[in-house]
């Protein structure tokens, strides 16, 4: 029988020690993603086994945040209040069938998000300085009027290019409520009705890998489904940590473990931090200095080339630039990859295992052993997460890592992979149309603070402006919907604070959110949004292996306080801006949903009727091809199915990158190269700055949060405390013991947080889980453990992306 947790427990202030006592779960088990604390310690598959009160309703909802999974939630409601949360109980719960999509501990804590004391209750306008969090309550009518009047004024004075939609992924999985990419949001639809807005490209998650592998494979680099690992003999993960980032029953970690049980594939994890993806399930962990993955690959490639472990036939048929046979005529002599690795290229340095060892910290004999294993084991699933690319040299590193799959001919086959992150099967479900943006100009999503500060100085060749040679105006208005990148998730918080404090620069900031986040405190107008539990929507899957699904995210309870849906807000603004009919097309939110669902049923005939789906809660469909294999058609017939690269082949040497390197204006230390070489980038461990700041600081996705979402849920914070991870050798030098308060600092800021002394970190490296809520004192010393106090706003060379894992710091005991 289901054990229901008393409301008194749910409502209580929970200390870490008290949580252990309350749930009877201690030590490592408490933090395990396999548990659903404190809601249930037993998985129940059949609804009939759960007794419900006569006045209790069970309504389907969803967790729609940006974790890489989307999970169904079954809300138990009594008298209009959510009492407790369960997850998917449909299907045969067989890995090879329509298995259950079980939510992790984050999704199961949704009740605590809905009833959180941080909930925004009514519209407010700022009365203090930005960032102080001082607001006064206003009516919805006043809020709409202020926004509409000022937006019209700014468009008249500066043009639509001065209006910017900031990055926000808090409701990434929604259809009506979708918050990213900006062009797919209801705010974008509103702005498109009013003349458009300044767009952005790239994202904080994957800017460098998207740009880097575009020059290798053409477009977004696809990967094999993780379910295809059942055909693999070897799994190699570079900075890929699905055990924490995509840890639900609908996510990659489930497929990884289930598939490995079938194939018994060896798994090697290459990461500065021993992650939960390992946790005893891996066969080998190879710790590596952050930002040196390309050097490791080059050392591996040296062994594979000199010992004839490469797939020469694959390289000759499918690739450009491996050796002189396929090198473009425009390239310099010995400009090919093989020459670079063997030391016959321009630098004259052979990339031996000993050379790589000095850079990476990986012993040379281990590099030789790993090269031989990868080169002689096929098929091999070689993949990279998005941690290695979040560096100053991230674009070029992603191209280097993919070389292991290319050199061994593992691309386009079952059990192999492209070297990118895993792919998945998806259904063609129709989302809300947002019309066309009349403004063609866009900037990197990471450069918006510069666009406020020096917009008209930003150019295409220096700053990556797209659509025109330069910006004409600075950003004067920001829409910040369902996102915390206004301050918390954007790098170099102290610089951002200084820029946003001056309201003569960016004159209007509108924040739409459910909670008083760190970013919400910088709003001029603050609008309270409904949670996913307070409105109707569809939630679509993400990293879902070879079983795609759609969730009916029904309205569970009435909107709390004065909260409104994003559709109602934007419709009311459209009315004041004179574009109501164009925006709504005469439909309510539910009418739009029924309209989109009817279109989706045409594309997916197996979908039930709208009302049947509402009762059913989730629709699942397995990939009819069995396993998704990236670039399979290209492998089978490269002439009939060319890639979208200029050559139609895999471009090891990219003439397009050579042209960019010759024309762009780059600061000293930035490198763009036609080959996937190793370059340290700025602020690496080799930087002279390491004499002052001798530790590398990297980030990771912590299992208690999804970026900053769920960062204010008490039980999750208690179960998985925010701590700085440090190796015992580095701690001993500084007199630091486990649990000590430490200060982490560099020229950009200072953070005070407890230390976690653990051999799970490589010596010379410390780590902070990203997404902790920024909590500064009067001196702007952060007490919340927010890594972005310490990160830099200097962008990466090619993507102009966030190098969040490229940081040098010092650590001292407080």
Curated annotation (Swiss-Prot):
Keywords: 4Fe-4S, Cell membrane, Iron, Iron-sulfur, Membrane, Metal-binding, Molybdenum, Oxidoreductase, Signal. Inhibited by dithionite, sodium hydrogensulfite and tungstate. Gene3D superfamilies: 2.40.40.20, 3.40.50.12440, 3.40.50.740, Dimethylsulfoxide Reductase, domain 2. Changing residue 71 to S: Cannot support growth. Exported by the Tat system. The position of the signal peptide cleavage has been experimentally proven. Can also be exported by the Sec system. GO terms for cellular component: dimethyl sulfoxide reductase complex; outer membrane-bounded periplasmic space; plasma membrane. InterPro entries: Anaer_DMSO_reductase, Asp_de-COase-like_dom_sf, MoPterin_dinucl-bd_dom, Mopterin_OxRdtase, Mopterin_OxRdtase_4Fe-4S_dom, Mopterin_OxRdtase_prok_CS, MopterinOxRdtase_cofactor_BS, Prok_Mopterin_Oxidored. It is found in: Cell membrane. Transmembrane segments: none annotated. Pfam families: Molybdop_Fe4S4 (PF04879), Molybdopterin (PF00384), Molydop_binding (PF01568). SUPFAM superfamilies: ADC-like, Formate dehydrogenase/DMSO reductase, domains 1-3. Residues 56-118 form the 4Fe-4S Mo/W bis-MGD-type domain. Residues 1-45 form the signal peptide. Mo-bis(molybdopterin guanine dinucleotide) binds at residues 172-176, 205, 244-245, 270-271, 291-293, 386-387, 390, 488, 512-513, 701, 707-709, 788, 804-805. GO terms for molecular function: 4 iron, 4 sulfur cluster binding; dimethyl sulfoxide reductase activity; electron transfer activity; molybdenum ion binding; molybdopterin cofactor binding. Its EC number is 1.8.5.3. Belongs to the prokaryotic molybdopterin-containing oxidoreductase family. The Tat signal sequence is essential for the expression of dmsA, the stability of the DmsAB dimer and membrane targeting. Despite the presence of a signal sequence, DmsA is not exported to the periplasm. Catalyzes the reduction of dimethyl sulfoxide (DMSO) to dimethyl sulfide (DMS). DMSO reductase serves as the terminal reductase under anaerobic conditions, with DMSO being the terminal electron acceptor. Terminal reductase during anaerobic growth on various sulfoxides and N-oxide compounds. Allows E.coli to grow anaerobically on DMSO as respiratory oxidant. This is Dimethyl sulfoxide reductase DmsA. It comes from Escherichia coli (strain K12).
